[in-house]
Each structure stands twice: as C-alpha cells, then as structure tokens.
Amino acid sequence: MSSGGLLLLLGLLTLWAELTPVSSKDHPEFCELPADSGPCRGILHAFYYHPVHRTCLEFIYGGCYGNANNFKTIDECEPPCAA
C-alpha cells in the first residue's frame, strides 16, 4: 500500500474513533439511549447521559414512560454513565 493510502487509512480510523460513542463496556447500555421526554406533557427538569459529549445534560421530561437514560439529578446520572 502506498504512503498516501496508509495516511488515508490512518485518518479514517482516527475519525471513526472520535465519532464512535464510548463502548457499552465502560457503562450500562441504557447510557447509550437518547433523551426521551415520553408522551406526557409535564415539564420536569431531568438529566440524561450524552455519549458523544461524554457528559450528563439537562432535558425536559414529560413525566411518564421515556427510557432508562433519565435521572432526577446530575449526581444520579454521573456515577453509572459518566464514570
């Protein structure tokens, strides 16, 4: 393979590594779920783990259903997901 081809391959692998979410081996699978406000119309401040940003972010939760990536406080979100 030419040096240009190797450089391209290295660049693509680097890009893939940066854009791929953290492996679920580092935290539970529910941490990979998107924020889900659910079908209800409440306005509750909640937190979810954002795998690309690798941090817990605030969102508005409707009050019912949603998914497991939903925490009442940032202190509840960080230990299982951001650790």
Curated annotation (Swiss-Prot):
Gene3D superfamilies: Pancreatic trypsin inhibitor Kunitz domain. Transmembrane segments: none annotated. The keyword Signal applies. It is found in: Secreted. Serine protease inhibitor. Residues 31-81 form the BPTI/Kunitz inhibitor domain. PROSITE patterns: BPTI_KUNITZ_1 (PS00280), BPTI_KUNITZ_2 (PS50279). It comes from Notechis scutatus scutatus (Mainland tiger snake). This is Kunitz-type serine protease inhibitor tigerin-2. One of its GO terms (molecular function) is serine-type endopeptidase inhibitor activity. GO terms for cellular component: extracellular space.
